Amino acid sequence: KLEAEARVLARCPDAVALRLPWMYDLPGYHLPIRGNLPLNILKASKTGEVLHFSRNDYRGVSYVREVIENLVPAMELPGGVYNFGSECDGDMVETARCFANLLQVDVKIEESDLTRNLAMDTGKLRAYGIEFSSTWGALRVCLGDYRLGYLM
């Protein structure tokens, strides 16, 4: 990916590359939705499935509608590579537990030993006036959009 970004920018310095995170939405707009963090948590709470996350896994998880809303201002960005999504608030165990808490469900989470850091720093975007909610804040926005704010 890094090589592809470098090659594109070498040929077209005005190109804009957006690095996207894991995204989610909830059912309700009659669009197909693949598995995502809140739906995986809701499913596991119903089925008793054990979910596995690591305290050494850092990544932002973004509400897709917030990503879409920020695409329009991104059209004005100068050439370059940008992290385009929510910054993480904690490791994935903390994030999964926060999501379960906000969704008001009990879910079994076992810790795995995966080590990965896909955390995004969106400071470069903020310098151009484009902002994202944090991972945990974005779920609050999502629940409000679907009028599920009573869960918070």
Regions found by a protein language model. Give the residues of each.
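Short glycine/proline-enriched coil/turn segments at helix->beta-strand junctions
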Residues: A10-A15, T47, M75-G80, N101-V105, ...
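Residue-level signal for the nucleotide or nucleotide-sugar donor/cofactor binding architecture
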Residues: R59-S62, G90, M120, I130-S133
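NAD(P)-dependent short-chain dehydrogenase/reductase
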Residues: R7-Y58, E66
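Two-component system phosphotransfer/interaction surface
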Residues: K46, R65-E76, R140-L143
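Mid/C-terminal beta-alpha module of Rossmann-like enzyme folds, strongest
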Residues: I68-L71, E76-N117, D121-T122, Y150-M152
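Active-site helix adjacent to the Tyr-X3-Lys
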Residues: L2-A6
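Amphipathic terminal alpha-helices
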Residues: T135-M152
